[in-house]
Amino acid sequence: MNFYNIFVFVALILAITIGQSEAGWLKKIGKKIERVGQHTRDATIQGLGVAQQAANVAATARG
C-alpha cells in the first residue's frame, strides 16, 4: 500500500513537470505533419481539377 502512494506521488510530480515544460520538439513534429496534410490536400484538389478537365475533353471528343 505504501508503494502505491509513492507511485501516485511520483506520477503526479512527473505529470506536473511534463505539463509545464515547453513542447518544442512536439510542436515541430506537429507542424511537419500539418504541412504534409496541407500538401496532400492541395495535390488532391489539383488532381481533381485535372481529372475534371480530362473528363470534359473526353466528353467533347465523343460528341
Swiss-Prot record:
<comment type="similarity">
    <text>Belongs to the cecropin family.</text>
</comment>
<dbReference type="GO" id="GO:0005615">
    <property type="term" value="C:extracellular space"/>
</dbReference>
<keyword id="KW-0929">Antimicrobial</keyword>
<keyword id="KW-0732">Signal</keyword>
<dbReference type="GO" id="GO:0002213">
    <property type="term" value="P:defense response to insect"/>
</dbReference>
<feature type="signal peptide">
    <location>
        <begin position="1"/>
        <end position="23"/>
    </location>
</feature>
<keyword id="KW-0044">Antibiotic</keyword>
<dbReference type="GO" id="GO:0050829">
    <property type="term" value="P:defense response to Gram-negative bacterium"/>
</dbReference>
<dbReference type="GO" id="GO:0019731">
    <property type="term" value="P:antibacterial humoral response"/>
</dbReference>
<dbReference type="GO" id="GO:0140460">
    <property type="term" value="P:response to Gram-negative bacterium"/>
</dbReference>
<dbReference type="GO" id="GO:0050830">
    <property type="term" value="P:defense response to Gram-positive bacterium"/>
</dbReference>
<keyword id="KW-0399">Innate immunity</keyword>
<feature type="modified residue" description="Arginine amide">
    <location>
        <position position="62"/>
    </location>
</feature>
<dbReference type="InterPro" id="IPR000875">
    <property type="entry name" value="Cecropin"/>
</dbReference>
<dbReference type="InterPro" id="IPR020400">
    <property type="entry name" value="Cecropin_insect"/>
</dbReference>
<comment type="function">
    <text>Cecropins have lytic and antibacterial activity against several Gram-positive and Gram-negative bacteria.</text>
</comment>
<keyword id="KW-0391">Immunity</keyword>
<dbReference type="Pfam" id="PF00272">
    <property type="entry name" value="Cecropin"/>
</dbReference>
<dbReference type="GO" id="GO:0051607">
    <property type="term" value="P:defense response to virus"/>
</dbReference>
<dbReference type="GO" id="GO:0045087">
    <property type="term" value="P:innate immune response"/>
</dbReference>
<keyword id="KW-0027">Amidation</keyword>
<dbReference type="GO" id="GO:0005576">
    <property type="term" value="C:extracellular region"/>
</dbReference>
<keyword id="KW-0964">Secreted</keyword>
<protein>
    <recommendedName>
        <fullName>Cecropin-A1</fullName>
    </recommendedName>
</protein>
